[in-house]
Amino acid sequence: MTAEQRRNLHAFGDYVRKTLDPTFILSYMAPWFRDDEVQHIQAEKNNKGPTEAASLFLQFLLELQEEGWFRGFLDALNQAGYCGLCEAIESWDFQKIEKLEEYRSLLRRLQPEFKTTINPKDILPEIAECLISQECEEILQICSSKGLMAGAEKMVECLLRSDKENWPKTLKLALEKEESRFSELWMVDKGAEDVKMKDLEDDEMKTCDVQIFYKEEPENQNLSQNSCSSSAPHTYSPLKPRKYQLELALPAQNGKNTIICAPTGCGKTFVSLLICEHHLKKFPRGRKGKVVFFAIQLPVYEQQKSVFSKHFERLGYKVAGISGATSDTVCVEQIVENSDIIILTPQILVNCLTNGTIPSLSVFTLMIFDECHNTSKQHPYNVIMFSYLDRKLGGSSDSLPQVIGLTASVGVGDAKNKAEATEYICKLCASLDTSVIATVRDNLEELEEVVYKPQKFFRKVELRTTDRFKCIISQLMMEIESLAKSIFEELGTITLGGLFQIQNSNFGTQKYEQWIVKVQKECAVFQMPDKDKESRICKALFSYMSHLRIYNDALIINEHARMKDALDYLKDFFRNIRAAGFDEIEQDLTQRFEEKLQELESISIDPSNENPKLRDLCFILQEEYHLNPETRTILFVKTRALVDALKKWIKENPKLSFLKPSILTGRGKTNQNIGMTLPAQKCVLDTFRTDKDNKILITTSVADEGIDIAQCNLVILYEYVGNVIKMIQTRGRGRARGSKCFLLTANADLIDKEKMNMYKEEMMNGAILILQTWDEAVFKEKIHQIQIREKIIRDNQGKPEPVPDKKTKKLLCKKCKAFACYTADIRMVEKCHFTVVGDAFRERFVSKLHPKPKSFGNIEKRAKIYCARPDCSHDWGIYVRYKAFEMPFIKIESFVVEDIATGVQTVHAKWKDFNFEKLSFDAAEMAGGAQDLGLQGMGN
């Protein structure tokens, strides 16, 4: 080891202390460390933590004089899994680790919410690559011995020390996969124009635009006349379609763009198979069709990929699928080219159209949109159709694919009458460029034998006359709000958007929870000059907001279930808080709860506090099972906490325990409520289908989204109402002959809303009938006019491009402030890459062979470039071969921009945020400058 290396290791010691747990590499350092030193380091970790242990380790390390210890240290880091730290020390470039600091800071301030929201066991497999193997084992051990909150705290501690540059994004993907509400707060974002540069730089291919839309998952049930249970093993055989399914498929098989609107449970998935098979077989020899089927959610994507594969691979067609979970590891262009049928989540195609991986929609001959009622606003479906309609209205000579939409309800939006409903449906048809709405008309009798429409009943019930439980919890919430207010007063003029705009009367509502989430998001991004104070304030506010959210949940449970269930929910939360090891704020909040606990216990067991809603629900269930002991029931509720509470109530109620309830919830997680995996959902449904003793299924909205559920003759909506589309879905669960559907609520407005939904359904059906009587040419002209109008609006709504700033500015190295180039020398390549022309710039950087050389289109990535100053070596970008030229591609995030006239300096994370005159690359400017990189000392 040289003296310079020793000095550097001492200088960069803070990075080692913040990252390394030395106990994980001590076994690899045995040749250099004495036993007493090893024991001293281990004791330091046990007593003071890994940072102090790393400091002691570094002290011993720098005192070593034996030959080879530095190489041994690097090898130990590699073997233990500290690859990022090892790479940084080898190159003395800690920029990648430094860039993680903003995410560490964000995670520190989000820690209170993380530990109350996340189940570490569920996301650990997804993020294990970002941790050391021993850390994963420690997290699991703590989960088992101390509980999930303590395990989540340990996971945060480990992530804060991770040296893996991709851990923030890996965590984001894991949270999204588990549909965790925490993912809304974990903000890891990249602009669309920068994605391509990142593709070249980091081999990442994702954008992260998250929007929430209503979804109806495709059903497997009633696919055909010889359909069988999804749980029964069988060899796939061709299915025989029903007459109404052939009727639904006919317009599409005749080549017309069509919306297929048919009830849940009738087998729309099977109809899409019929259309797809007919489409592929119609092409003459020498030509081939190419179908893309869009599914919005990952479970639906997986289900449809399986269904299409089983049906079409026996016919010799190649079926492939690409989702957000797989797009990083596959070549989208190649899969699309080599497959006959591609199942996609729609954002994948949006990304590919944006970056040019797929040049246009003309590569497809048929597009099928599942849940097509979502084709509005900025939903990926609509973005895809914008591209389609721009080509159509622009007179492109390229052939466009046939378009098919599938839905149980087209909806009517805010329509007040049949004319407005007709206009709304026409707009949906215009968005999908469809001139036919296919419904079952000639074979209604057969459809009604498959899908029965239940009778609808409304039950208005009363609330408790007095609610002491709510009064006590509301008082605790007001105290917490006061504590939070004192934090805001400490901030002085700095505010986060007005904490106290929500009145106490909103406790126990969804509106109050939305406000909590809003405050948490604002806390996550606000900044102060004093970073320690900023961290302390953010952490305190997150603790207060987390407790307010739990109390809010408890009030909702109390309103709709037993006080006992709400109290149990709170006790579970505080039990987990204690097991996790709480700070002073949490100790104070826990003490406040415990002071009221005895009174809450007494109130919760008082029979006079029984919930009138449960009394009425018990009466309905007893009455229906008395009339028909074979009744099968689905009970819809709003939240997972209510699912658990009502299950406990039924099991503990001697009048209802014979129902043997099972539960079905979604895959995401909220607070203490753990979501169900896809296999767990299937297991519940199979049991409900086959076990006659299991008479009631309690579920959230997941069951109105097309999951394959056995026929039921009783549907109960317990304070559960949505829009007209959701109403049709939930009602569709009552499929048995003679079915009944009850809406049970204490809120008269919900009954009015459901009646309005029924009226809107009539309007929708009437509007569809009107449109089906229109002459097709008239209908086409109508939607064409809508398309033209919408395109004009869309074009005019585009953000105006800022006037380019033509003043010349300097780019300085962000690390050492060395001069790099002038903006006048920067040229834009393919709209998203930026190079610098002129030989002078080549003297200001050095290069090293790229560890992952790769080609993308016209670009071959060859080397990394760094600031030429020996004491800097800051990462500036990459060196590429573009067509016939060798050139650098620089990253604006690596530089400081200085205004020559004023001396003002600014930084920009993305090129699109930097306003200057962006001149396009001209090959003539490269004359004489296209020397090979090897002449400049490749490998410097």
UniProtKB/Swiss-Prot annotation:
InterPro entries listed in its UniProt record: CARD_dom, CARD_RIG-I_r2, DEAD/DEAH_box_helicase_dom, DEATH-like_dom_sf, Helicase_ATP-bd, Helicase_C-like, P-loop_NTPase, RIG-I-like_C
Ranges where the RLR CTR domain occurs: 795-928
Name of the coding gene: RIGI
Official protein name in the record: Antiviral innate immune response receptor RIG-I
Single GO term (MF): double-stranded RNA binding
Keywords: Acetylation, Antiviral defense, ATP-binding, Cell junction, Cell membrane, Cell projection, Cytoplasm, Cytoskeleton, Helicase, Hydrolase, Immunity, Innate immunity, Isopeptide bond, Membrane, Metal-binding, Nucleotide-binding, Phosphoprotein, Repeat, RNA-binding, Tight junction, Ubl conjugation, Zinc
Location of Phosphothreonine modifications: T773
Tissue and organ expression note: Ubiquitously expressed, with highest levels in spleen, liver, intestine and heart. Up-regulated in tracheobronchial lymph node and tonsils during porcine reproductive and respiratory syndrome virus (PRRSV) infection.
Per UniProt, location of the Glycyl lysine isopeptide (Lys-Gly) (interchain with G-Cter in ubiquitin) cross-link in this chain: K48, K96, K154, K164, K172, K190, K815
Residues noted as binding ATP in the record, renumbered to the chain: A262, P263, T264, G265, C266, G267, K268, T269
Modification sites for N6-acetyllysine: K861, K912
Catalytic activity, reaction form: ATP + H2O = ADP + phosphate + H(+)
